[in-house]
Amino acid sequence: MVVGAFPIAKLLYLGIRQISKPLANRIKAGARRSEFFRTYVCLPPAQVYHWVEMRSKMRIMGFRGAVIKPLNEDAAAELGAELLGEAIIFLIGGGCMVAEYSRQSANSHRKEEEMEARLGSMEAEIARLGLLTEELETRARVTERQQLAGK
């Protein structure tokens, strides 16, 4: 009985994706505590996200040109940390997808090369058998002529 190959790569990707959420939570907590991350990594994207979100909502509701107040520092740091965590999870998931795609592509390419090699050897065998058949036909004709000449 043949057992199929164990999908260790898929299991590994699943494990990485499961670990990404707690990892993102730790990075978010560190970003909230660190003044550098808070100021330069969390706040700017959060303010831009808030501005785009509020601008979109205002336009949908029909308020054009309304002034949008920036978030306070604590709210912006919290939103920025959440955005950072989601970006990390997204990047890890995307990386896993790209890795799985490249692995599948390499497997497919390898199988295709094996099939081409097998096809090439079969074609060579067919050509060899064709020559052998011609040689045997020639021998059969020679033998037949010799038998007819000997009678």
Swiss-Prot record:
One of its GO terms (biological process) is regulation of lipid metabolic process. Residues 106-131 form a coiled coil. Keywords: Coiled coil, Mitochondrion. The keyword Signal does not apply. It is found in: Mitochondrion. The keyword Ribosomal protein does not apply. Its main location: mitochondrion. GO terms for cellular component: mitochondrion. It comes from the Eukaryota. May play some role in mitochondrial processes. Belongs to the OPA3 family. This is Optic atrophy 3 protein homolog.
